[in-house]
């Protein structure tokens, strides 16, 4: 899932506050 307070974009968290990372997170969720 996506946690916007996390500034990471890895296979564990799949998220960060960067737009590209958010999109990546949403598609790979």
From Swiss-Prot:
One of its GO terms (cellular component) is extracellular region. GO terms for molecular function: ion channel inhibitor activity; potassium channel regulator activity; toxin activity. InterPro entries: Huwentoxin-1. It comes from the Eukaryota. Expressed by the venom gland. Pfam families: Toxin_12. Keywords: Calcium-activated potassium channel impairing toxin, Disulfide bond, Ion channel impairing toxin, Neurotoxin, Potassium channel impairing toxin, Secreted, Toxin. The keyword Chloroplast does not apply. It is found in: Secreted. Its main location: secreted. Disulfide bonds join 2-16, 9-21, 15-25. The keyword Lipid biosynthesis does not apply. Negative results: At concentrations up to 330 nM, does not show activity on transient 'A-type' Kv, delayed-rectifier Kv, voltage-gated sodium channel (Nav) and both HVA and M-LVA Cav channels in cockroach DUM neurons. Belongs to the neurotoxin 30 (phrixotoxin) family. The presence of a 'disulfide through disulfide knot' structurally defines this protein as a knottin. Insect-selective neurotoxin that potently blocks insect calcium-activated potassium (BKCa) channels (Slo-type) in cockroach dorsal unpaired median (DUM) neurons (IC(50)=25.3 nM). This occurs in the absence of any shifts in the voltage dependence of activation. May interact with the turret and/or loop region of the external entrance to the channel and does not project deeply into the pore of the channel. In vivo, does not show toxicity in mice after intracerebroventricular injection of up to 25 pmol/g (1.8 ug/20 g mouse). This is Lambda-theraphotoxin-Ec2b.
